[in-house]
């Protein structure tokens, strides 16, 4: 399984430097939509990394597909918008229990 990264230039640069080969650089919402669809169809990709703000800009149906996706597993990083979650919330969603209580 491979790792794929979708995002703007400043987001994906570090992943490129780390040796990630499947990097999809986006500039607008239509390019992010096509990149996400391409990754969802590629069965060799096991993990998809995206910036939370880029996920928030996607159409609702595509966001739902990403949230429900098992393969690839979607990892959303960063973001300050309404859709961003704290680490605590992400763990609670993944595990189903609030471990900090």
Swiss-Prot record:
The gene is atpF. One of its GO terms (molecular function) is proton-transporting ATP synthase activity, rotational mechanism. Component of the A-type ATP synthase that produces ATP from ADP in the presence of a proton gradient across the membrane. It comes from Methanosarcina acetivorans (strain ATCC 35395 / DSM 2834 / JCM 12185 / C2A). One of its GO terms (cellular component) is plasma membrane. This is A-type ATP synthase subunit F. It holds the Pfam family ATP-synt_F. It is found in: Cell membrane. Has multiple subunits with at least A(3), B(3), C, D, E, F, H, I and proteolipid K(x). HAMAP family: ATP_synth_F_arch. It comes from the Archaea.
């Amino acid at each position: 399984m491979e790792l794929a990264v979708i995002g703007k230039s400043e987001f994906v640069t570090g992943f490129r430097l780390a040796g990630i080969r499947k990097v999809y650089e986006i500039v607008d919402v239509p390019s992010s939509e096509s990149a996400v669809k391409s990754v969802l169809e590629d069965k060799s990709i096991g993990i998809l990394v995206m910036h939370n703000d880029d996920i928030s800009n996607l159409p609702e149906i595509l966001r739902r597909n990403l949230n429900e996706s098992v393969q690839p597993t979607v990892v959303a990083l960063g973001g300050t918008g309404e859709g961003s979650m704290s680490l605590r919330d992400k763990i609670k969603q993944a595990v189903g229990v609030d471990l900090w209580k």
